[in-house]
Amino acid sequence: VGWTRNIRVAALVAVAALGLTACGGGDDKPAAAGKGGAPIVVASFNFTDSQILAEIYAQALEAKGYPVTRKLNLGSRELIYPSLKSGELQFIPEYQGSAIAAGFGKDPVKDAKGEHEQLAKLLEPSGVSLLDYAAAEDKNTYIVKADLAQSKGLATISDLKKLDKVVLAGGPECEKRLTCFKGLTDVYKLTNATFQTVQELGPRVQQLDSGGVTVIPVDSVSPQAGDSKYVALKDDLSMVPTENVVPAVTKKVLDERGADFAAAVNAVSAKLTTEGMRDLNKRVDSDGEKAADVAKDWLSQQGLV
């Protein structure tokens, strides 16, 4: 997720201009201990998967009686992390590998548990903690056309060596990233690979379908990653780090809200899967539904509301 999303990051603007300060909320009913006070400010990055996840967690908390204010579609970590540190934002669903690499400029370790520990240590000085990570991931996945995979025996990224020529299409940042084209040449040692800049996903898919390019990166939760027209190549040399979804929450909120709050959040994370998120992303991006509506449906289906 995160490493190819510069093309989706809006220009940074002043935090004050976005009005990130939490708004108060009234409730005539007496609140249970840990559930009163100012709303919890739940944020998201500016892409579909993040917005859906933020809605899922926000609605789950509201169903448990916690007041919530949403600040969605905000932009990049450059904006959001300072606001988490200051307490203006208090909760965001993160992606472990990207948070480590893009948020702190560090190399992620190669497993989800290790990443969780690594990210927790990096966030600790900012007064931010992590709750349980989910099985769901939103990471770079590399797809080829299914007929090409079948005819050439392509199942892994390493198998691209079988081809005379490999053309990878991606955003301009892909060319120099070890998780993208540079990884094909430096990690997988492909000498038959060339790069073609295609900024947006739609034209990239069109180029793949027409045979103009061989392979493209997509998000693992995108409809293309699960489409039978394509084959997602296994990252057999672990070029791309794990990107498990993990709620990042300010320590102040965790201390104030207590164990029941953490349990409510962890119950949501325990139900999230990559396949499930792919379906929700399709409903928003392809079918035109609203993130809040698909989040509500999912929570109901999972028995969480």
Functional labels for PLM-detected ranges:
Residues Q90, V166-D236:
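Ligand-binding pocket segment of bilobal, Venus flytrap-like solute-binding proteins
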Residues G24-D27:
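Bacterial signal peptide processing site
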Residues A33-E55, L72-S76, E173-E175:
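Extracytoplasmic "Venus flytrap"
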Residues A112-L168, K251, A270-T274:
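A conserved helix-loop-strand patch within extracytoplasmic ligand-binding domains
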Residues G103-D111, H116-L131, S210, Q224-S238:
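Ligand-binding "clamshell"
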Residues T48-P67, L89, K182-D186:
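Short, polar/charged alpha-helical segment
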Residues G19-A22:
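C-terminal motif of bacterial Sec signal peptides marking the signal peptidase cleavage site
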Residues T48, R70-P82, T194-Q206:
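Short helix-initiation/N-cap motifs at beta->coil->alpha
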